[in-house]
């Protein structure tokens, strides 16, 4: 590495010495050499002698002019162009060259298949031209694109199309104008040949907006669901938040080579094709719902992210936490609120809590960053959304919406901070959030311990609630947080007991603000069964000594669907922890009859929503289970999880088969009732696959071959792989033969291969690096094969001999120079070495030291490796 990357600190923020009000861009496009001309209107705000320091990387400078005169008062440094002796107001003209085809990092302007496209968030615009690449510089963009018409018939950018024309030699040009000032991370350009799905949306004020969805030629029949999702998003944002779209056109382009999921560029969203393309035979129910969610997320950014952006990147959760909350609400309003909440909580418990306990622990508003791309995290996004949800819980929907309106009134068209958002919520609601603000600055997962006491003589029930947040890699000292803690109390017949104190009703959301607090409730005539942390009202770990009877009672009687699922999770957690300890001592699995009976009751409950039943019957993932332990034993977890599956499969075989047969559907519809039935049926098939082999093999093979949709086909294939059924290899080969030319569909196959419990899985993964459908230059392929192996097959990745670690080192060595952003995502399982036993830690540390010694180690990897080794 040439020099050690330097950290940036939130407290060092200062406004820029110069602002750019308008920028006129011209691109003379060619994959090998593109000429960029940037004409900026600049104004000095700093000291008269302050130089203009522009960001730029991998650029070839051609010329600089100030007010049309050639300018020589400048110098180039690594990553910067410093221009001196400037007047207070001036026009700056910079011409430079770039090579999109050589840009394998996929930041800035790059080649995706035969198309050219951009990705500028967080700091990609500096790979296009020299500029003030920071989010607090908002300018109006005009963009002219010139290109060969046969290669690039469509030339797209932000805003509205204002002019176009033909040129000699088969070339043409299009000019775009975006009337809304924006930071350069929201700039976008796409050039290519596409099929286009067109539609319109009429806003509530009566404006007609043109909707255009661009997909690769031949994929038009996979675009309609994305268009439906976009129109639903636009309607929902008007109805729920009162927010209307503001341009004449809204475009989405699907590209195959993309580091992230999607990007909210103003008026021109660029999407990973994974979150656009869907057809019954290529996409699962989950794919359809993910497309709906991500289309919604990027559309909702038009107001929460674009119209109001971030002052600096430390404030990223201002737009992302808020917009994830909005997309979660969108999915919940359109679908099943309980199932969506369960999905969000699985992510928090299985993945975000692990991030809090890792060397990369940070608050939702980080204080220190080396590489900004490393902070597009579950903490900033998902925990950030939980913080917004807590504000919503404390204020209520009406006051929350008043806060949103005030936030837009104050900050529309500007760059704001997290404090600005909280202040707007406070001022609109008159609710004091000063203590609550600690959620923005304190990292880690709070542990809330609850003890209860019932006094039959006074008919009082008391909860003693204490909180502590363990020290994290970035913060040793922790303070008590303001935790909204939702509860319900049930009598022995399953009725909710009204909460009272001193003759007055008590809010079911308790405000826990101290290290320890006591809450007493009157007129409780029987020992109640408590439902605690209802709806996961705060992102905390809960400690309470549940009895099995309490949990099975809640599974049956809780009026809140989330509480029913959560009780099942707690019941499973009890016996998973017990059996991991037994496994480590060489003892067999132990599961009391009443646990299986509790799950049998779910299967026999005719009133339960099938989607909820499926969630209750889905065992926690290996990653969720890992969070139950201080020291993770991945092999014991995998073996106990499989033994538990086989035990339930044997105990409930008749019920699983009956429910499986009862939920057959002839037609495929993306309908929440049908999705629930398919999910339940496939959850049953998963258990049946671990039952009697001959029946399992027959059922799975038949479902795979009879399936008229990808959901059922993939569920069968996944069951065959998980249970290692005799039909596995034949079915996997059939899938490969049918779909090998479709990368997105093959990603599902690569994930099944790389997460297989087979002993030779690493050997298989190594072999698949040479598969005809695999490419080390495509992030989706890399994530589905290498990423899934390292992140979702812990038993194989953490093999005792260290072979999994060595494999990842080899892959990261390649990706370090090819695509540092993707490399940085893949290293996550390796940096969490302190959660494992000494022998594994030693091997993981050696692997990290090996990577640290790489020549030209990227800043992305350097930051994570040095924190892990600290």
PLM regions and their residue ranges:
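N-terminal, polar/Ser/Thr-rich
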Residues: 1-35, 110-119, 131, 135, ...
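Short, hydrophobic/aromatic-enriched beta-strand segments in well-ordered soluble domains
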Residues: 37-42, 56, 88-103, 141-149, ...
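A surface-exposed beta-strand-loop module
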Residues: 45-112, 133, 168-170, 174, ...
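Beta-strand-rich binding/interaction modules
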Residues: 60-67, 432-435, 445-532, 577, ...
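Extended, low-hydrophobicity, Ser/Thr/Pro/Gly-biased non-transmembrane segments
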Residues: 95-198, 561-564
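Hydrophobic alpha-helical and helix-loop surface patches within well-folded domains
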Residues: 176, 204-458, 462-463
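Long, ordered, helix-rich scaffold segments
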Residues: 350, 377, 522-870
